[in-house]
Amino acid sequence: MKSYTPYFILLWSAVGIAKAAKIIIVPPIMFESHMYIFKTLASALHERGHHTVFLLSEGRDIAPSNHYSLQRYPGIFNSTTSDAFLQSKMRNIFSGRLTAIELFDILDHYTKNCDLMVGNHALIQGLKKEKFDLLLVDPNDMCGFVIAHLLGVKYAVFSTGLWYPAEVGAPAPLAYVPEFNSLLTDRMNLLQRMKNTGVYLISRLGVSFLVLPKYERIMQKYNLLPEKSMYDLVHGSSLWMLCTDVALEFPRPTLPNVVYVGGILTKPASPLPEDLQRWVNGANEHGFVLVSFGAGVKYLSEDIANKLAGALGRLPQKVIWRFSGPKPKNLGNNTKLIEWLPQNDLLGHSKIKAFLSHGGLNSIFETIYHGVPVVGIPLFGDHYDTMTRVQAKGMGILLEWKTVTEKELYEALVKVINNPSYRQRAQKLSEIHKDQPGHPVNRTIYWIDYIIRHNGAHHLRAAVHQISFCQYFLLDIAFVLLLGAALLYFLLSWVTKFIYRKIKSLWSRNKHSTVNGHYHNGILNGKYKRNGHIKHEKKVK
């Protein structure tokens, strides 16, 4: 019998080639944790037959791979200088400088780098010739929107942070949807709702008058046509892929073109390296505690490091701590310092009891995946929002690095280790996170394929961006109702006054026509006596 298998294979290959797309990704110019996610996506896209290009500055370190290619440009940073810049920001924050000031300084560097990209004529012309099918924007660095507009290519947002911006257009009732950086939950009292409203208004003003205008000035400088505002570009995104999850995020209204894909880096634990396996095997029934503040935070202040070392040294558990810098003087004998560690594999080990973290999103999703309780000390950015949700969900405790004491840290660690409710909640959230159609990577690739297949998937976009502020909040209807009420009031007032005048006029006439209850036959007063008899008039001679 003739086999048709080769023909089916050939047909399938042809279909795959037909659907293959060229995708360009514009990652932020710093924060290597974001690149971990994008490299994972690039590998998955490669398996689907797509070709991915990273737009990176010269000198930025990235391992070569057959899964993606690189388009370099002369930017303001290379890997060494960007890391040094980020560590300087951390030192400034630890020394007491306002976090907001440091974040705005980062924004200034984002826009300076964006100016270099947009003004690089050779770079832009080369990218235009590539005829990309899709551009992925990380909204942490909003230059991606400008590049997409410049290239005239469809684009989608992939947010690597815990961020659900109001600019998406989804309803956000402030009574139960906490604003980013508010440190609130979906259960708010009166004062908290007032705070949430204030943070929302400040955020919208900051975005409208401080953030977006910086990029608009770049577009005006290089006369980008057709003229569009940054709001138009943000609203023009085909899809919003957000790194959050139903296990972590508070329930809230959303839109069809918004999908949750948090947990891109989650995976089962692999066997530990031999030296670490021996160390873990040496842990008694108390197990071990993992400590890591992420790849982006290489140096803690001496004060914080000493507090951590003191609290960790009092635990009966063994401690493995990802740490760089001078060794704390009060380091306990139970604590092992190491500059790099396989975090996911340690989190998945059966002997782990707790995780002490800064609340970075990638770390928290790995923690949720493996069902491990957390003590979080957020430092900046979305760390606070992430740990607020972890604490509200019952799988961890949030501590403030500026005020926490060694005793408070020790007590928090003991609590999450010895109170079984924290591990039970962590394991339940792990079940919820995993009980979804496919791994987050597969869901992300599906949606990228979807918007490519449907040429931007405009049918998913709500009309919210085509209506004005007055229409959205029904202010025009309120105006019509108020105007109608005012007209009705004046009409009723006029009718009432008219009727009143008529009644008053009739009453006045009747009053003048009657004296002591007797009618005067229509003759004016004075022609009759008061007793009702006729009064004779004297003739005038």
Swiss-Prot record:
The keyword Transferase applies. GO terms for biological process: central nervous system development; cytoskeleton organization; galactosylceramide biosynthetic process; glycosphingolipid biosynthetic process; neuron projection morphogenesis; paranodal junction assembly; peripheral nervous system development; protein localization to paranode region of axon. Residues 1-20 form the signal peptide. InterPro entries: UDP-glycosyltransferase, UDP_glucos_trans, UDP_glycos_trans_CS. It is found in: Membrane; Endoplasmic reticulum. It catalyses: an N-acylsphing-4-enine + UDP-alpha-D-galactose = a beta-D-galactosyl-(1<->1')-N-acylsphing-4-enine + UDP + H(+); an N-acyl-sphingoid base + UDP-alpha-D-galactose = a D-galactosylceramide + UDP + H(+); N-(2-hydroxy-hexanoyl)-sphing-4-enine + UDP-alpha-D-galactose = N-(2-hydroxy-hexanoyl)-beta-D-galactosyl-sphing-4-enine + UDP + H(+); N-(2-hydroxy-hexanoyl)-sphinganine + UDP-alpha-D-galactose = N-(2-hydroxyhexanoyl)-beta-D-galactosylsphinganine + UDP + H(+). It holds the Pfam family UDPGT. Keywords: Endoplasmic reticulum, Glycoprotein, Glycosyltransferase, Lipid metabolism, Membrane, Signal, Sphingolipid metabolism, Transferase, Transmembrane, Transmembrane helix. Glycans are attached at N78, N333, N442. It comes from the Eukaryota. It is a single-pass membrane protein. The keyword Transmembrane applies. One of its GO terms (molecular function) is UDP-galactose:glucosylceramide beta-1,4-galactosyltransferase activity. GO terms for cellular component: endoplasmic reticulum; endoplasmic reticulum membrane. Pathway: Sphingolipid metabolism; galactosylceramide biosynthesis. The chain crosses the membrane at residues 472-492. Its EC number is 2.4.1.47. Catalyzes the transfer of galactose to ceramide, a key enzymatic step in the biosynthesis of galactocerebrosides, which are abundant sphingolipids of the myelin membrane of the central nervous system and peripheral nervous system. Galactosylates both hydroxy- and non-hydroxy fatty acid-containing ceramides and diglycerides. Belongs to the UDP-glycosyltransferase family. This is 2-hydroxyacylsphingosine 1-beta-galactosyltransferase. It comes from Homo sapiens (Human).
